[in-house]
Amino acid sequence: MSNDSSVVRDPLYGWVMVISVFTLTALSFGTMGSISVFLKPLSNEFGWTRGNTAFGYTVASLGSAFFGIIWGYMADKYGTRFFGFFATFFMVSCLFFLGKQNSILHFYALYFCFGAFGNAVVGSPLYANVGFWFKKNPGLALGITAAGGAAGQGIIPLISTNLIRVYGWQDAYMYLSFLYLLIMVPFSFLIKESPWRKKARIAVNDEFRDFPLSEREVITWISCAVIFCCICMSVPIVHLIPLLTDASFSEDFAASVFLVLMIFGIIGRIISGKLGDMIGALPTYILMSIGQTISVLGFPYIDFKVGLFVLAAAFGFTYSGVMSAILVCARMMVSAKLAGRAMALGSFFGWVGMGLGGYFGGLLFDIKGDYTWSFQFASAMGSVNIFILWQFHKRIKKQAHATA
């Protein structure tokens, strides 16, 4: 890895990229999160089970996972200049036609396309681009950028809730498509490739990395951990609003709790990114994972409003901190030339985990009749993630000592 500390000033355009990717991922992640508010209206209208409806999130996640690898490779080889426009076309089209569908197969197909050709395109490839605009404080830059996902997951479900109430779920999807078109096109024009990434792409020799483990081993460890931490976090993302409305809380209150979760998620992503610059990416990842694993367990057991807001804030801060820490790990442990593929592979396992968590959360609800098992399952998967991260930490220390 290059000596980042020797460079004092980063290109100012890097902050334009931060704002642009923040916005695009806010819309993309917002749609993924808004499945939770469409879940009950769709289940009620078509008679689909919670598990079957939540599977829409799963197929979107799997689309993001598998195609994310392709887009990561394309980003490393050709750059990301036109990724915003490509994602705009598919995200807008999928939202528009979701308002027209009346079959669960069409529902799955449209969410798969949204994940594969929208969410996957503006996710890890653009994060890799942003990370290598910055040599001085890449963690902070990535934390702010990643905060867009949390912002979108709080704002878009709230907008969707109000649109559904006023216009119904069909028109809600179509109005969202118009809104996305107006916002995404201008920001897509601002996407440019990192100069560092451009140089790395044409360089004959590999750049120096000051890290004890090979890039392949780093990616393997991160990928193994990510799948379990994302299973943990996806259960509340998909099922928190149905959990609260099943407990006789209003839809407005449920959406407000989710909004608080995501507001603190914005804070968590930024602080986690900066913390990664200060104490290291992996210690930050472990710390945030512990908080996520503990806090997710409480949702089925707290039935008073203040407690739910406090718990949502704690979970939002730590789960979002995990997301930033993953990105900073990839940025600091792999080279610029491989960054797109590294983040895409991590994202692959992350989205597989998100999809599995969303599905099994619904399946366990269908079996048990409430969400107790679902959230216990989420916490158990978080514990597996912490174990893997601790072994990764020990492996780094051992190899660093051996090569000292």
Predicted regions and their residues:
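Hydrophobic core of transmembrane alpha-helices in multi-pass small-molecule transporters
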Residues: 26, 94, 105-121, 227, ...
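Extracytoplasmic gate region of multi-pass secondary transporters
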Residues: 35-39, 217-272
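Intracellular juxtamembrane helix-capping segments at the cytosolic ends
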Residues: 42, 120-134, 321-334
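C-terminal ends and interior cores of transmembrane alpha-helices
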Residues: 89-102, 291-303
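Cytoplasmic helix-loop-helix junction between adjacent transmembrane helices
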Residues: 112-147
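Helix-loop-helix hairpin linking two adjacent transmembrane segments in secondary transporters
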Residues: 145-192
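C-terminal transmembrane helical hairpin of 12-TM major facilitator-type secondary transporters
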Residues: 262-265, 271, 276-329
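A late C-terminal transmembrane helix in Major Facilitator Superfamily
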Residues: 333-370, 378
